[in-house]
Swiss-Prot record:
Function field: Cytokine with immunoregulatory activity. May promote the transition between innate and adaptive immunity. Induces the production of IgG(1) and IgG(3) in B-cells. Implicated in the generation and maintenance of T follicular helper (Tfh) cells and the formation of germinal-centers. Together with IL6, control the early generation of Tfh cells and are critical for an effective antibody response to acute viral infection. May play a role in proliferation and maturation of natural killer (NK) cells in synergy with IL15.
SUPFAM superfamilies from the UniProt entry: 4-helical cytokines
Listed name of the protein: Interleukin-21
Record keyword Membrane present: no
Source taxonomy: Eukaryota, Metazoa, Chordata, Craniata, Vertebrata
Gene Ontology terms: biological process: cell maturation; cellular response to virus; germinal center B cell differentiation; natural killer cell differentiation; natural killer cell mediated cytotoxicity; positive regulation of B cell proliferation; positive regulation of cytokine production; positive regulation of immunoglobulin production
Record InterPro entries: 4_helix_cytokine-like_core, IL-15/IL-21_fam
GO terms under cellular component: extracellular space
Cleaved signal peptide residues: 1-17
Record-stated family: Belongs to the IL-15/IL-21 family.
Record localization: Secreted
Region of interest: Disordered: 100-120
Gene Ontology MF: a single term: cytokine activity
Entry annotated with the keyword Transit peptide: no
Amino acid sequence: MEKIVICLMVIFLGTVAHKSSFQEQDLLLIRMRQLIDIVDQLKNYVNDLDPESLPAPEDVKRHCERSAFSCFQKVQLKAANTGGNEQIINVLTKQLKRKLPPTNAGRRQKHRPACPSCDSYEKAPPKEFLERLKSLIQKMIHQHLS
């Protein structure tokens, strides 16, 4: 009887642990897909954005994706004060700045590679900035699924 209870507990705990890791993955994928939608919406307003060039990471090294993503989040995308789209742009940029859910890979990584600072990235106009951001998010999704 005791052995059966122990076996059932092991099976139950294995199922719960497996399920929680899938939930984390799902949250991250959902968030990244939301980010792609937000970037696509911002592209509709690219002519209403301040034309100032912004640091936009490109060709990001493996394991530096989250660092590069945080560089994108630190940038201040601003409306050019032309038209009534300022409020929409502000809402979308606030949504871009929400943190990504944590991942097990990020927690396990003890030795993190040296990633370039945000200032070291080449500056790009808003349209290219948004394209690079979308490309990075797609890369992160692909790596997460593989």
